[in-house]
Swiss-Prot record:
GO MF term set: ATP-dependent peptidase activity; ATPase binding; serine-type endopeptidase activity
PANTHER family: ATP-DEPENDENT CLP PROTEASE PROTEOLYTIC SUBUNIT, ATP-DEPENDENT CLP PROTEASE PROTEOLYTIC SUBUNIT-RELATED PROTEIN 2, CHLOROPLASTIC
Subunit and interaction comment: Fourteen ClpP subunits assemble into 2 heptameric rings which stack back to back to give a disk-like structure with a central cavity, resembling the structure of eukaryotic proteasomes.
Gene that this polypeptide is encoded by: clpP3
Species for this entry: Nostoc sp. (strain PCC 7120 / SAG 25.82 / UTEX 2576)
Subcellular location: Cytoplasm
Documented EC number(s): 3.4.21.92
Catalytic site positions: S101, H126
Any Gene Ontology CC annotation: cytoplasm
Protein name: Probable ATP-dependent Clp protease proteolytic subunit 3
Gene Ontology terms describing biological process: protein quality control for misfolded or incompletely synthesized proteins
């Protein structure tokens, strides 16, 4: 039986009364965003909107993006990535559990020096996948686009990890799993959190 979204008490600054709000709304007020599902257009739009709002409120203050995601749509993930690069606020990324596929891409996209994972987290990189049906020309167009996106993602991973592009291409050819420590050595994150930040 699902428990739904938990509610927590919150009193607005200067307010007289306490309201019950969703735990995610409460976390947003502390500049914490939680990505705990597949990356799709809906969650991407929500994350982008919150990032833009928080950045406009206080552009010098860090935004925390906690990630426990198996990945998802490349275009949705790239929209979040572009927003992270666009805003003035540093984005601290923290893997809690799993950051796979587009989840690991966003983890590595955090501000350098502020990319972290909990000790028992798993991180996985791989090439993008896609599927299409139809006429041969449609399949050819889709294949060219997937190859273009794969090259783009490989280039960004190489920039964010300081790994040679050839190594990234080889490692991403199939699912490549890493522990938090291995991800740090690889350059996807900057540190493993052993104690509370």
């Amino acid at each position: 039986m699902p428990i739904g979204v938990p509610k927590v008490p919150y009193r607005m600054p200067g307010g007289q009364f306490t309201d019950w709000i969703s735990i995610y709304d409460r976390l947003y007020r502390e500049r914490i965003i939680f990505l705990g599902r597949d990356v799709d257009d809906e969650i991407a739009n929500q994350i982008i909107a919150v990032m833009l709002y928080l950045d406009s409120e206080d552009p010098g203050k860090d935004i925390y993006l906690y990630i426990n995601s198996p990945g998802g749509m490349v275009t949705s993930g790239l929209a979040i990535y572009d927003t992270m690069q666009h805003i003035k606020s540093d984005v601290v990324t923290i893997c809690v559990g799993l950051a796979a596929s587009m989840g690991s891409f966003l983890l590595a996209a955090g501000t350098k020096g502020k990319r972290m994972a909990l000790p028992h987290s798993r991180i996985m990189i791989h090439q993008p996948s896609g599927g299409t049906r139809g006429q041969a020309t449609d399949i050819e167009i889709e294949a060219r686009e997937i190859l273009r996106i794969r090259h783009q993602l490989n280039q960004i991973y190489a920039n964010n990890t300081s790994q040679p592009l050839a190594k990234i291409e080889k490692d991403m050819d199939r699912d490549f799993f890493m522990s938090a420590q291995e991800a740090m050595e690889y350059g996807l994150i900057d540190r493993v959190i052993e104690e509370r930040v």
